[in-house]
Amino acid sequence: MPDFRIKDHPVLTAPGDATVPFSWKGQDMKAREGEVISSALFANGVRVFGHHHKDGSPQGIYCANGQCAQCSVVADGLSVKSCMVAVKPGMKVEPLEGKAGLIDAPGPLQFHEIETVDTEVLILGGGPAGLSAAIELAKAGVGVILIDDKAALGGKLVLQTHKFFGSIDACHAGTRGMDIGEKLEAQVRSYENVRIWTETTALSVFSDRKVGVLRQGHYVLVRPQIILVATGARERSLVFKGNSLPGVYGAGAFQTLVNRDLVRPSERLFVIGGGNVGLIAAYHALQAGIQVVGLCEALDECGGYKVHKDKLVRMGVPIHTRHTVVC
């Protein structure tokens, strides 16, 4: 069976071996401890997770951030977003083809009393904005609950292996993004008036100002005085025929696979977009041992920092300005 895991990286340390057994369409596979289903499938060479309900075209991942549902599968009888759910020992994973059926559960569902939690401020999102807001509020003595749908805080900072530019005070210049995330998290956790709930999603805001959240499988009502929304970036794709096929990914999904989960989605890569995200993603690919066959930008010049572009040029990456993709 092919293994697409990155074992050697100039910045990141590869985690332990894949020892958690699971199956995909009846085929035995292994995942790393805590690895999400989508990354485990990619590491085992699976790129097609299902097929589009309209035309039957193959579907894989797009955002790998829990937003688009394109990577949905059936895991142990439940329809889940594969990029958000960790593999469990013995888990049976199948494609979500058509409508999911009802699970075979004995007896009626057991309901529990819903807990209501009060707080001064509820922050939705544990990325750089949410963490920074929590720090400033905590300094002022404000009670905060900070929630994030991932298992770890930091948002997109977790995916950034390069060193940041700017001033040291304003944006931690000279520090890698992933290390900035750890610094901000440590600072937030040092305040007793901040409660952190990971693997938690806000589901609804009711007319009485209560917020329904799903916290690690349990429903909780939060009654905040103020709601601060810091839900972060979303993938935006260039519109062209075939842009949802396996092999076409958002930059964030690519960085999630390569930099967070150390999984190589391909051996060769072409990047669309010469802004900072595209330029940096191309460099991340080179760090992971992926051949970047080119980068295109529709404008006359790349819009990202020249230092990022020059780095790619020095490493032999062809950059095509005034070019785009049509299909």
Label the model's feature ranges.
Residues 57-63, 172-181:
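Aromatic/His-enriched, Gly/Pro-containing loop or helix-boundary segments
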